[in-house]
């Protein structure tokens, strides 16, 4: 079972009584056929539920009102099978607070050249019914997604499925609770921000709990639970000699297991699905949570270090969006560069907390080594390299008057040399279009040093995320040129200033 099983998407057909009962009967029949086919063959993440035809303002408004109050409804897919006068949709769309996708399709793929008549034309009017619907969306300044293509086309299936992921993630975000253990790293700017504005814009709440509250739960974990989790570690990872049963760091592994069990219990009891820690506030914990955080991220929790609640929330959102897709998604940080003409590289990592979902190794190494930051005992961590291939890094920043999502398309590559003295998980990548352009654009746009790294999601997914939440997006990819990028930032400043 996945999070998508908790939701459904309503399929709404727009028409009108002008065409008579027989035409409406055929419209309903077509809709039933299309919905059944999409549910059985399109591999959509959510079930489509066909609703009664929308043929009058009252019917349409009732559907939209019901959608708002149904917690299982993640959004609406609308198909204008015939012409549906768009003034009928005004009241419904004005109150709708769920995501909306217009499926611009028709029942037949090919025109029946020899038999086409006006009855056929009146029945299959998506071509101009869809345009009428599009006008009212533009007139009401309500942005919605549009997918054009025949309902049997696999590309259309893929695009609808991607939108469904966004719709479900938006509903999950409205319920998301972010727990901050301690505060931000002192004097750091980008990890701070307006939590009230974030809750108004996205729906997630951010609150702080004392590390002492967590420590109480951690200290309540019994040896039996710790032993069971250690057995799981033994079967899932390659333990270094120091961490094996008679190793001199075995107790550190047991303490890491205690912290993991305590953190998970605390998060479950509080209904949290994202959290932050900071190495400056660890009072009562024997080590910085490393292994615990890595494993919790792999289970779907959002996380970021140093109190960075925006990145923690973004990671949870992207984890939901990517559920069931190939490739992983992780907290990440641009750590250091490799400058080589024509082969500039970025080495990404963090002190400990990189999610194993992006690991190339089937069984990462579990080790305990010294960590100079934090002043605690040596922490346990998983060490691995990252899968290669196309990926993205994304940063959500608070500009005071709005949020900006910054996305850099990257290509992860194999590490050309072993890293025998690097005791943390890492990812190595080439930034698009090149490191100088990408880094300068990122800096000019105010992108954070913390990011969410993903092989599972792509730029199109993040564009949809920005659209569905109505926030600015700045993209750095192979098409980026700095003069145009700077102009776009200036234009966005004017646009969003006027939009306020």
From Swiss-Prot:
<dbReference type="Pfam" id="PF24856">
    <property type="entry name" value="AraA_central"/>
</dbReference>
<dbReference type="InterPro" id="IPR004216">
    <property type="entry name" value="Fuc/Ara_isomerase_C"/>
</dbReference>
<dbReference type="GO" id="GO:0030145">
    <property type="term" value="F:manganese ion binding"/>
</dbReference>
<dbReference type="InterPro" id="IPR024664">
    <property type="entry name" value="Ara_Isoase_C"/>
</dbReference>
<keyword id="KW-0119">Carbohydrate metabolism</keyword>
<feature type="binding site">
    <location>
        <position position="306"/>
    </location>
    <ligand>
        <name>Mn(2+)</name>
    </ligand>
</feature>
<dbReference type="GO" id="GO:0019569">
    <property type="term" value="P:L-arabinose catabolic process to xylulose 5-phosphate"/>
</dbReference>
<dbReference type="InterPro" id="IPR009015">
    <property type="entry name" value="Fucose_isomerase_N/cen_sf"/>
</dbReference>
<comment type="subunit">
    <text>Homohexamer.</text>
</comment>
<dbReference type="InterPro" id="IPR055389">
    <property type="entry name" value="AraA_N"/>
</dbReference>
<feature type="binding site">
    <location>
        <position position="350"/>
    </location>
    <ligand>
        <name>Mn(2+)</name>
    </ligand>
</feature>
<dbReference type="InterPro" id="IPR055390">
    <property type="entry name" value="AraA_central"/>
</dbReference>
<feature type="binding site">
    <location>
        <position position="333"/>
    </location>
    <ligand>
        <name>Mn(2+)</name>
    </ligand>
</feature>
<keyword id="KW-0413">Isomerase</keyword>
<comment type="function">
    <text>Catalyzes the conversion of L-arabinose to L-ribulose.</text>
</comment>
<dbReference type="InterPro" id="IPR038583">
    <property type="entry name" value="AraA_N_sf"/>
</dbReference>
<dbReference type="GO" id="GO:0008733">
    <property type="term" value="F:L-arabinose isomerase activity"/>
</dbReference>
<dbReference type="GO" id="GO:0005829">
    <property type="term" value="C:cytosol"/>
</dbReference>
<comment type="pathway">
    <text>Carbohydrate degradation; L-arabinose degradation via L-ribulose; D-xylulose 5-phosphate from L-arabinose (bacterial route): step 1/3.</text>
</comment>
<dbReference type="Pfam" id="PF02610">
    <property type="entry name" value="AraA_N"/>
</dbReference>
<keyword id="KW-0479">Metal-binding</keyword>
<dbReference type="Pfam" id="PF11762">
    <property type="entry name" value="Arabinose_Iso_C"/>
</dbReference>
<keyword id="KW-0054">Arabinose catabolism</keyword>
<keyword id="KW-0464">Manganese</keyword>
<protein>
    <recommendedName>
        <fullName>L-arabinose isomerase</fullName>
        <ecNumber>5.3.1.4</ecNumber>
    </recommendedName>
</protein>
<dbReference type="InterPro" id="IPR003762">
    <property type="entry name" value="Lara_isomerase"/>
</dbReference>
<comment type="similarity">
    <text>Belongs to the arabinose isomerase family.</text>
</comment>
<feature type="binding site">
    <location>
        <position position="450"/>
    </location>
    <ligand>
        <name>Mn(2+)</name>
    </ligand>
</feature>
